[in-house]
Design a protein with these regions (language model features):
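Hydrophobic faces of well-ordered beta-strands that scaffold small-molecule active sites
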Residues: 13-19, 39-41, 61-67, 86-88, ...
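C-terminal helical cap(s) of enzyme catalytic domains, especially alpha/beta-barrels
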Residues: 54-56, 136, 150-168
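Generic structural signal for well-ordered alpha-helices
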Residues: 2-6, 28, 49-53, 73-76, ...
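Catalytic cores of alpha/beta
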Residues: 23-33, 70-83, 126-143, 157
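Glycine-rich phosphate-binding active-site loops on the catalytic face of alpha/beta enzymes
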Residues: 39-48, 87-97, 138-159
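Glycine/Thr-rich beta-alpha phosphate-binding loop at enzyme active sites
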Residues: 69, 77-110, 114-116, 154-161
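N-terminal active-site wall of soluble small-molecule enzyme domains
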Residues: 1-55
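Conserved, mostly hydrophobic/aromatic
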Residues: 31, 86, 112, 124, ...
């Protein structure tokens, strides 16, 4: 790889990097070089929206914009329109597993659907089989669940249970 540092098997595995960093627009190219095929950028972390859009579109990489439950997604409609997907945080304290799902996300989902019809919407945090089913019914296309899967006696069965929800 000529001295380049990349995540293992990035030529075969699609890696999603969830950038929980300030001013990500200054380093986006670095994450692609590390092997990311998809980036999640938290709206609150962007310092310069114009520079961010210039940099992210130049990379020709799949990207999504993430929002906390306290964010007013309607204020970010321009970014939502341009993003490949939207990720909503189902919890307020980002980075801590095992938290209770925040129902404010349900309103955010509806607002996203009004801003961008057919949007790919992901929810990360507070996800269990019940909340995943509820979210699927209102149009959420992806869920991210850590503690329910990794805390299960058999994580493979837990993953299959989540997959079955998408077939309902």
């Amino acid at each position: 790889m000529d001295g380049e540092i990349r995540v293992p098997c990035s030529d075969k595995i699609k890696y999603e990097f969830d950038l929980m960093v300030m001013a990500p627009e200054t380093d986006l190219r670095k994450y692609q070089k590390l092997g990311a095929s998809r980036l999640i950028i938290h709206a609150d972390s962007i310092d310069n929206q114009e520079l961010f859009l210039k940099e992210i579109t130049s990379l020709k990489i799949e990207w999504g914009i993430a929002f906390k439950t306290s964010n007013d997604v309607k204020k970010w409609s321009d970014l939502i329109q341009k993003a490949n997907f939207v990720q909503l945080m189902g919890i307020e304290n980002i980075g801590y597993q095992g938290q209770t799902f925040d129902p404010r996300v349900l309103d955010q989902v509806n607002h996203i659907k009004q801003i961008k019809a057919g949007a790919i919407i992901s929810v990360d945090g507070g996800i269990n089989l019940e909340t995943a089913h509820e979210l699927a019914q209102i149009g959420v296309t992806r869920v991210v669940s850590g503690s329910v899967v990794f805390g299960a006696n058999n994580p493979s069965v837990s993953i299959e249970d989540f997959k079955n929800i998408s077939n309902v």
